[in-house]
Amino acid sequence: MRIARSRCLRTSCPGMDEKEGCEKMMIFSTEGLEWTREPADYYIGADRIEITTQPHTDLWQRTYYHFRNDNAPVLQMETEERFFSFVVKTDFSGSGHRFDQCGIAMYLDSENWLKASVEYENESFQHLGSVVTNHGYSDWATTEIPADVRTMWYRLSRREDDYCIECSRDGKVFSQMRVCHMHEGGGRIRFGIYACSPEDSSFRAVFTDLQMTDCAWKAHDGQQPD
């Protein structure tokens, strides 16, 4: 995955703060993608990526459940860009077993990462949620959605070491899932996609419409700090 930039010659642009400057991220490709735990079955094409999950793969660290699961495949790029958004559409039509999931990830190391996905639960509902792991402890924020939802868009936005995760049903109107701080996410980072099946199951996760944009998460201009 590669980003090529065209820099505006103006010193500032409407809606951009001074630290951001004015950078247009133009070109997105799959060159430069790197696996953390390469799966046995996958496909990387010009317009889609497919991952067939393997049973008993997962990401979680310590909190509540006490186990440390760190074997899900993650496909990522590296960047030092401090302000950008990453968008992807996920199709998980083949999922049908508890905890089957696929979505976006920013995996720095086993104890510092985030992810967002839909986790299948049963024929009635599934969990749309996100996990943020800082210094070895995961949290999980979720909401229940109908089990017949089979696609979801995600947008991950970065503002230095702060991040915003959003989701969308149509790829046009995005809703905030969470805002978070990554203690180790202020410099060079890795981010991309993941898929896994924590129990004894497998499904094909399909990722399309991957794109980079200027940071869609604008600087805060509301209430001033005390």
Report the location of each language-model feature:
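Extracellular glycan-recognition regions
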Residues: 22-226
